[in-house]
């Protein structure tokens, strides 16, 4: 996965949103409806191309997860881009299903890679704990928790999780992939008007199921089933704990992806590719 388009191609950055309800995640799969599959099909159609141009994305969201601020890139032949640049957004809007929208398509600066150049990803997870349930008009984006939640206890637990750690206890292990991440922010707020609690979760990157597992641990603290120190104790153990529940995906939204200044894009991509170890960790 290069940080430059091949000669004769233009790297195009795409900024997009989607409602994840009816998608089997971002990544294309045989016989399943995915965000990547829909966009690649639409690109092939509107550019009248005989080949599929593969997308690279900042955050590979799971089935049912939404995105407001997703970023991807695609390398298009220079002739294709020159022909379709001006009308590409409008044509894609007419071809794509209504639950996925592309808001911007523009040539990316040198060194840009939607996945590896990213400095951080910011997610929001929304939970309602009112006895009567969740507003029917927001039920597709808010989880209902049937016990009252203590905001202060959840934030006390969250503060112990921030920093660079091995999040193996909160991730679904993937062969050859590190579970070391820097959790930059984990903070809960409650909307006084609706009562909905929103967790802001920001990190340089996330491993599989990490956000939803962190939320699951926080809810057990919030409803009093676990003490505030428990999520950090699970983290320190570095193994999956059967008590950590991965919450449902529909409450989760990818809100924003941030990138460094153009001159630093390639360096950031190279840094992100390095296999990470914690300070003081041995090689063997």
From Swiss-Prot:
GO terms for biological process: tRNA pseudouridine synthesis. One of its GO terms (molecular function) is RNA binding. The keyword Ion transport does not apply. Homodimer. Formation of pseudouridine at positions 38, 39 and 40 in the anticodon stem and loop of transfer RNAs. Belongs to the tRNA pseudouridine synthase TruA family. PANTHER family: PSEUDOURIDYLATE SYNTHASE (PTHR11142), TRNA PSEUDOURIDINE SYNTHASE-LIKE 1 (PTHR11142:SF0). This is tRNA pseudouridine synthase A. The lineage of its organism: Bacteria, Bacillati, Actinomycetota, Actinomycetes, Kitasatosporales.
């Amino acid at each position: 996965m290069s940080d430059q388009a091949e000669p004769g191609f233009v790297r195009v950055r795409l900024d997009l949103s989607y409602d994840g309800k009816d998608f089997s995640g971002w990544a294309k799969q045989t016989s399943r409806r995915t965000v990547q599959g829909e966009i690649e099909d639409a690109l092939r159609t509107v550019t009248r191309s005989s080949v599929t141009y593969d997308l690279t994305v900042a955050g590979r969201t799971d089935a049912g997860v939404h995105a407001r601020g997703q970023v991807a890139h695609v390398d298009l032949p220079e002739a294709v881009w020159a022909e379709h640049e001006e009308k590409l957004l409008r044509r894609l809007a007419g071809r794509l299903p209504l639950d996925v929208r592309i808001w911007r398509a523009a040539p990316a600066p040198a060194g840009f890679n939607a996945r590896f150049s990213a400095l951080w990803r910011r997610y929001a997870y929304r939970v309602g704990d009112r006895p009567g349930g969740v507003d029917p008009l927001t039920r597709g984006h808010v989880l209902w928790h049937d016990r009252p939640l203590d905001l202060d206890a959840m934030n006390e637990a969250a503060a112990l999780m921030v920093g660079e750690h091995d999040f193996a206890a909160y991730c679904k292990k993937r062969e050859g992939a590190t579970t070391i991440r820097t959790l930059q922010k984990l903070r809960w707020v409650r909307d006084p008007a609706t009562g909905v609690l929103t967790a802001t979760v920001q990190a340089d990157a996330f491993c599989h199921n990490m956000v939803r597992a962190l939320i699951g641990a926080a809810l057990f603290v919030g409803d009093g089933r676990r003490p505030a120190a428990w999520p950090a104790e699970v983290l320190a153990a570095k193994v999956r704990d059967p008590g950590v529940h991965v919450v449902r995906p529909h409450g989760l939204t990818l809100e924003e992806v941030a990138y460094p200044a153009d001159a630093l894009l390639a360096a950031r991509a190279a840094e992100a590719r390095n296999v990470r170890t914690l300070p003081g960790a041995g090689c063997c």
